[in-house]
Amino acid sequence: MKKFLIFLLAVLALTFVACEKDKDIESYLDMERINSEFNIEKQDKEQIKFTDKDESRSVYRIFNFQKMKSVDFKNPKKIDKLEEFYLGKNCEIIYKDESTIIVLVLAQDNSYAYNIQSFDDSKTELMMAVSIGSDKELSEDELFNLLDEAKSFIK
């Protein structure tokens, strides 16, 4: 009887894990808020990309959330590979830790472009990216506020 119960629990656990993998990305995000405040540019089961409705904002944001394969998510060198990529494109690394990288991609003629990429496993294995266009240089605190805003979409 004990073996049967353990077997049953194992099957239920595997079923739960399999069901989680099949969930659409929107089941992890506050879609009501996203739909009311942003334009959805691209959406499928694995990813969603949305932008500010007001294109003339002084700080224009593009958010991208993507479910990742477990093997890619668990790669301990994923941030290092991103850093290598950005440095190869002559970008300036503003901040980097084991799950987040913030990069100044372009600064010219009072225009600034930033990328923030972060990985979150609180609900599922998600990659979050925020691309920012600004008419002023943003402080590290302002960039972290944008990262916090991106994280706030995860329910």
Can you say where each PLM-predicted feature lies in the sequence?
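Signature of long, low-cysteine stretches enriched in small and polar/charged residues
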Residues: 84-121
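Short, solvent-exposed coil/turn segments at beta-strand boundaries
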Residues: 31-36, 53-56, 66, 96-99, ...
